[in-house]
Amino acid sequence: MKGQEGIRGEGCTDPEIKASPQMWAARFRGMRSRFSPLFSQATEMGPRVSAGWCLSGGGRKVSSLQGDFPPGGFWALSNDSALSLPPLSLPHPHPLRPPGLGVNEFTQGLHPPLHPAASVFQTCFYRKPHYCSTLRPTTT
């Protein structure tokens, strides 16, 4: 999956979701409260909890809802569905992340070695500038 293509799932065809940013905001607030900040647990929960969600336009719709998340933006972790994580999981800016360091390198520096059998996920930090990268989430 390429980040600029957005995250595709059944939610993309739901006109009710497309037509109502308020509904998106409410549903993402509810989703956020159910997710662990750990990538490993989020990986297990993601396909089951959030199947069918869609972030279109490379995340523009979701980044427009930043006000519904803690200050500074939020992380989204996804494969074919949307999974939002509060910034406490990977705070930004972070003292361990030198300027210009990619998301992959940053993630590998904070977590145990990436599990080679894990699914490839796309992660983006929705704040200007956006940080997007493909990674393999950790398992513990």
Curated annotation (Swiss-Prot):
This is Putative uncharacterized protein NTM-AS1. It comes from Homo sapiens. The lineage of its organism: Eukaryota, Metazoa, Chordata, Craniata, Vertebrata.
